[in-house]
Amino acid sequence: MNEPLSELQQRAEDLEYSELLDAAALAPARSRERLLLVAAFAVSAYCGVHRTGKPFASLLGETFELVSARKGFRFLAEKVRHAPTPINRAHASGRAVWTFDLEDELRVRLAASSPGGIDLAPAVLVRVRFDDGDAYR
């Protein structure tokens, strides 16, 4: 059963705990405190994995924009490729001078060893950058 969200809207949920990035931006560059806050933000993306429904597939060229005045960030996502493997890209920027870039791709391959003969491997690359030059992947 599908849930009433698109893939792109679901990606915006990764910023549910963006206040961790706001706090990390205020921490000293290359400090353990910043690393800890960025790691906590990375783990927070798993808060939505309990769902059993799948999101609606976005159409090629479809975009989704979310501006959260309460949390102080702007998020923009687009489906940039549909076949042979779907790719979504997203960018967000926050008031505390951080940026968040995401690219996700669902790699599909035929594999006799997998149940059903299809092997699905999601590949997600996330980059977080701060205005002082610190960057995390």
List each model region and its residues.
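Extended acidic, Ser/Thr- and Pro-enriched interaction/regulatory segments
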Residues: 1-137
